[in-house]
């Protein structure tokens, strides 16, 4: 590479630290691949390779500055034989008009600006010029930008190549291509070509050694840079271009070097002060740009006067060269190529620095330290506006007469320079628009954008970063568009249409939440009211179990309407309560959506503020939920802030309270299923809600990591599961808690319980009633069957004796009803028993089966049935275990709290009944082995246990357990039970006593017992309970019958 170094001194500036020109792929999408894909900034070293467009030509004399290189540059590079002045101006070549059109596609924009970052590499062999390290940014070189005056570098050589076709010193903006994307350190001098010591007017001499480097730089950048930085090589709306290009100082600064986009090859290069033969139309910019009087056409950077007193036309034309080359004093007026500076600088209009201004590194204030800040969509480092007299934010101003308005041009350059009235600074008009655009969406991006701009304005010398890519720009162009609409739309909370869901290039439905939440209140209130009427309790419990999947409104309704619910079941009350929650929910959800989108910076700042303000609401809801006495409150609050599972989360995310039909659909099923359970007292639904919610709470609480609502809720839950406490108080308490915000720890049996308790008890009592009826029917059939037949059944029946016991009178119908009830619990997620919900599946503790439903069965027998069906018991988590114990099963061991899937209970239930039947037969036959003895001893327990299951309905204390000392009388009780069972099934009152005469005394005794039991309605009179049971009339049979009819 050393041999390729230009023979002439480049000056210290040239060898200052030069940032590498590396393409920023982030913005490539915006530019056509043709523009920059060919040669992404490949330059990684200290040399810039300048590919030569064509075979070496006689231009060598023109390239005299680069004595070794001129042959390398083809006419294509130099353009038509450039007049001496033209070639050297700004060290830029323009191709002959003829060549331009053909090569335009190839490298026209690139060739126009030797250093245009976007320029394509030239077909010719690449030249490696030492990478100039610009201690001073290009701006420094510009006398106009710095206003400093003559260059302090050896660049003082007169760079004012009158030839406008090269980079015009007066029109640095046009001359400068947005070449240095990574570093704007390339000084105008460098771009111009390191000041050729030869007079700038000698085009060949003036072609400084930097020119090849500049061209290579341009090539490198143009290929990679244009593609990556420029959204499109083709002119866009000036406004769009402004927003994209001007936004980045790179684009604006670089543009002067050369059009980042490929335009007609010649067009990009400023026309020689003496326009080259190529037709002016070839230039992307109107010919006006070429003419000094139209110098205003040079876009963002007004052509600065040639350094030090290069006033007059040279001032305009040499703007770039002059800024870079202080020698440019003699520069002839150059009209910036129209296509060179397509992007107006966002900075305020650059006042034209006096041509006599000295170019000094001190211009740093004018040089935007951070070019990236301005770049919205392009990584171009705008060549410092200071080169043009002012960097975008620096306040340097190119001559107003040179102001050019960027106009969309067909040329590769996105914008062509359009002459602006001399009075109208191009950068200012452009900047307002651009700023306006930025402001629209900057709220989120403003932080990033503003900082770069500040640095840009800061006075310190331009520090060219390796990647001048704007901090936010790469993603900003889309963001800007989206955000522009978003802030406006979000300003009005109910957007007319959902905002774009893309945030930070990530698709998200979060923005839709606000939109969806707006209509949510009406949609949800209707379904909610409808749901609440049929059975709000089921809806609430179901919704909670589902994690608020669309029934949340319903839940909220019941909970929200707690005060009203007890007295008012009307839709109005529910609607009001629902609307209130929804109103709260929508801000909360909006806040959550904003919260999710916050990192994206695409959200509007106001929204973020709202989010922050709303977050307290969320927090408050969470905190309130645990504190509130009633579980309903918890259900209302929890759904918003927490999710039972990923399913619930997805439901909230994609169906944010919006689905009016969903509540209707979900609730309809709930009400339909609920009516059967609630038949005894359809109206009182709040009571069951409390109970069910409590039952469901364990999971909710566990998942949410929330403390249980309050002692009242626990108290309510505990009475319900415990058969000993009268169910009435529990029911009363549940309604009270549901309706009363204040905790109601003490069970109060009031008129409310009467109305509301039935629904709560209906589900559990109905099921337990069915179960008790089944057990009674089985025991009754066994009791009045002859022992011979029983023994035959035991021998012939299958392992569980299903065939035998299923033939019992009424068993088939009751069993079908009970199984359907179990399936309904699972389907509707309304389990009356303490349970845990996992991933939408309900699990009940095995305690329900072993202790409540089949207390007489040995646990080993139950385990055997589970094994036969391959049913797996799942251990509870610590939180679930704690919740279950607190709510319903305080005395249960961990073994008894193992979880059984509710959906598997219908499969094993018939076999468990078979075990029950076998136990009855063994007891009836008096076959007492150790197990039988335990069973017989537990017989009283069974009798008691089943009533116990009905205890909620009976409101009677558990009967005493009688020791199994009396074996002789056991047959009598069996018969009595059988008779009672038959009677419950519809058999004649006391025919069973004659089934097997144990003895006259016992027979008479049991007959009396059966009669009294029948009169009293007891299904299972037992030997040990004869004294107390007859005295306690219990409507259990009637209740069972009515329930079964309803079923």
UniProtKB/Swiss-Prot annotation:
Gene name as annotated: C15orf39
Biased segments, Low complexity type: 729-741, 751-762, 978-996
UniProt keyword terms in alphabetical order: Acetylation, Phosphoprotein
Source organism, top-level taxon: Eukaryota
InterPro entries named in the record: DUF5525 (IPR037656)
Region feature (Disordered): 172-208, 236-283, 448-469, 482-504, 519-567, 668-690, 714-763, 931-1004, 1021-1047
Biased composition (Polar residues): 237-254
Full protein name: Uncharacterized protein C15orf39
Residues with Phosphothreonine modification: 397
Extent of Pro residues compositional bias: 268-283
The keyword Phosphoprotein is annotated on this UniProt entry: yes
Gene source species: Homo sapiens
């Amino acid at each position: 590479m050393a041999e390729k170094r230009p023979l002439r001194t480049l000056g210290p500036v040239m060898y200052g630290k030069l940032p590498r020109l590396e393409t920023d792929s982030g913005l490539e999408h915006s530019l056509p691949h043709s523009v920059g894909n060919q040669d992404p900034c490949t330059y990684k070293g200290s040399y810039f390779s300048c590919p030569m467009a064509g075979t070496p030509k006689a231009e060598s004399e023109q390239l005299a500055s680069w004595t070794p290189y001129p042959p390398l540059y083809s006419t294509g590079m130099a353009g038509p034989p450039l007049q001496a002045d033209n070639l050297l101006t700004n060290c830029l070549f323009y191709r002959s008009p003829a060549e331009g059109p053909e090569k335009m596609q190839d490298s026209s924009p690139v060739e126009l600006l030797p250093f245009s970052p976007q320029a394509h590499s030239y077909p010719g062999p690449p030249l490696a010029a030492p990478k100039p390290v610009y201690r001073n940014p290009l701006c420094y070189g510009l006398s106009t930008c710095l206003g400093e005056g003559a260059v302090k570098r050896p660049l003082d050589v007169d760079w004012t190549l009158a030839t406008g076709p090269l980079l015009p010193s007066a029109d640095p903006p046009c001359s400068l291509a947005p070449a240095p994307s990574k570093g704007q350190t390339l000084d105008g001098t460098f771009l111009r070509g390191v000041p050729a010591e030869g007079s700038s007017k000698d085009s060949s001499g003036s072609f400084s050694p930097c020119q090849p480097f500049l061209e290579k730089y341009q090539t490198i950048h143009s290929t990679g840079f244009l593609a990556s930085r420029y959204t499109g090589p083709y002119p866009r709306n000036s406004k769009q271009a402004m927003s994209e290009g001007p936004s980045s100082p790179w684009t604006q600064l670089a543009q002067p070097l050369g059009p980042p986009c490929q335009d007609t090859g010649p067009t990009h290069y400023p026309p020689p002060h003496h326009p080259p033969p190529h037709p002016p139309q070839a230039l992307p910019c109107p010919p006006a740009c070429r003419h000094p009087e139209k110098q205003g056409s040079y876009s963002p950077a007004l052509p600065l006067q040639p350094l030090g007193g290069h006033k007059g036309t040279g001032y305009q034309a040499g703007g770039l060269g002059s800024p870079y080359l202080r020698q440019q004093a003699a520069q002839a007026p150059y009209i910036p190529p129209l296509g060179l500076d397509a992007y107006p600088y966002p900075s305020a209009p650059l006042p034209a620095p006096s041509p006599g201004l000295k170019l000094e590194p001190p211009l740093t204030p004018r040089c935007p330290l951070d070019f990236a800040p301005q770049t919205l969509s392009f990584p171009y480092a705008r060549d410092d506006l200071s080169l043009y007299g002012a960097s975008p934010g620096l306040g340097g101003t190119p001559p107003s007469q040179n102001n050019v308005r960027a106009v969309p041009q067909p040329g590769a350059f996105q914008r062509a320079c359009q002459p602006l009235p001399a009075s109208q600074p191009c950068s200012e008009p452009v900047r307002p628009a651009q700023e306006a655009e930025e402001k629209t969406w900057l709220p989120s991006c403003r932080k990033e954008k503003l900082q770069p701009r500040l640095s840009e304005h800061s006075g310190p010398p331009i520090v060219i970063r390796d990647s001048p890519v704007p901090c936010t720009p790469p993603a900003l162009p889309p963001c800007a568009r989206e955000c522009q609409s978003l802030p406006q739309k979000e300003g009005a909370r109910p957007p007319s249409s959902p905002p774009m869901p893309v945030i930070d290039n990530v698709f998200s439905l979060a923005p839709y939440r606000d939109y969806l939440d707006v209509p949510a209140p009406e949609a949800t209130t209707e379904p909610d009211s409808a749901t609440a009427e049929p059975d709000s309790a089921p809806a609430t419990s179901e919704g909670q179990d589902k994690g608020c999947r669309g029934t949340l409104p319903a839940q909220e309704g019941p909970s929200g309407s707690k005060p009203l619910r007890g007295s008012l079941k009307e839709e109005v009350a529910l609607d009001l309560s629902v609307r209130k929650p929804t109103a709260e929910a929508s801000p909360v959800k909006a806040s959550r959506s904003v919260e999710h989108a916050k990192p994206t910076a695409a959200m509007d700042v106001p929204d973020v503020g709202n989010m922050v303000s709303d977050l307290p609401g969320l927090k408050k809801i969470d905190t309130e939920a645990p504190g509130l006495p009633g579980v309903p409150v918890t259900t209302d609050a929890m759904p918003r802030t927490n999710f039972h599972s990923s399913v619930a989360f997805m439901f909230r995310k994609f169906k944010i309270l919006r689905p009016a039909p969903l509540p209707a659909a979900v609730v309809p099923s709930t009400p339909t299923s609920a009516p059967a359970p609630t038949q005894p007292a359809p109206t009182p639904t709040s009571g069951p809600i409390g109970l069910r919610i409590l039952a469901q709470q364990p999971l909710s609480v566990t998942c949410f990591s929330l403390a249980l609502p309050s002692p009242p809720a626990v108290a309510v839950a505990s009475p319900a599961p415990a058969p000993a406490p009268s169910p009435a108080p529990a029911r009363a308490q549940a309604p009270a808690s549901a309706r009363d915000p204040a905790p109601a720890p003490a069970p109060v049996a009031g008129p409310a319980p009467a109305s509301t308790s039935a629904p709560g008890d209906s589900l559990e009592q109905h099921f337990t009633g069915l179960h008790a009826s089944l057990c009674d029917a089985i025991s009754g059939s066994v009791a009045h069957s002859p022992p011979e037949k029983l023994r035959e059944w035991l021998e012939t029946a299958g392992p569980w004796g299903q065939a035998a016991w299923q033939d019992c009178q009424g068993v088939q119908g009751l069993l079908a009803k009970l199984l359907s009830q179990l399936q309904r619990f699972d389907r509707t997620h309304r389990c009356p028993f303490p349970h845990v919900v996992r991933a939408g599946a309900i699990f009940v503790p095995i305690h329900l089966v072993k202790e409540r439903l089949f207390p007489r069965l040995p646990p080993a027998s139950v385990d055997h049935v589970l094994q036969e069906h391959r049913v797996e018991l799942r251990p509870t988590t610590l939180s679930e275990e704690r919740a279950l114990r607190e709510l319903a099963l305080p005395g249960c061991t961990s073994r008894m709290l193992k979880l059984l899937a509710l959906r598997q209970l219908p499969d094993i239930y018939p076999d468990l009944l078979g075990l029950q039947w076998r136990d009855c037969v063994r007891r009836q036959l008096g076959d007492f082995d150790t197990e039988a003895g335990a069973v017989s001893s537990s017989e009283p327990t069974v009798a008691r246990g089943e009533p116990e299951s009905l205890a909620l309905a009976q409101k009677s204390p558990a009967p005493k357990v009688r020791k199994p000392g009396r074996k002789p009388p056991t047959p009598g009780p069996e018969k009595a039970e059988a008779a009672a069972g038959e009677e419950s099934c519809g058999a004649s009152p006391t025919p069973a006593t004659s089934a097997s005469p144990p003895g006259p005394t016992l027979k008479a005794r049991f007959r009396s017992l059966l009669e009294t039991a029948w009169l009293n309605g007891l299904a299972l009179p037992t030997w040990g309970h004869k004294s107390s049971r007859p005295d306690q009339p219990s409507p259990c049979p009637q209740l069972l019958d009515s329930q079964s009819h309803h079923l």
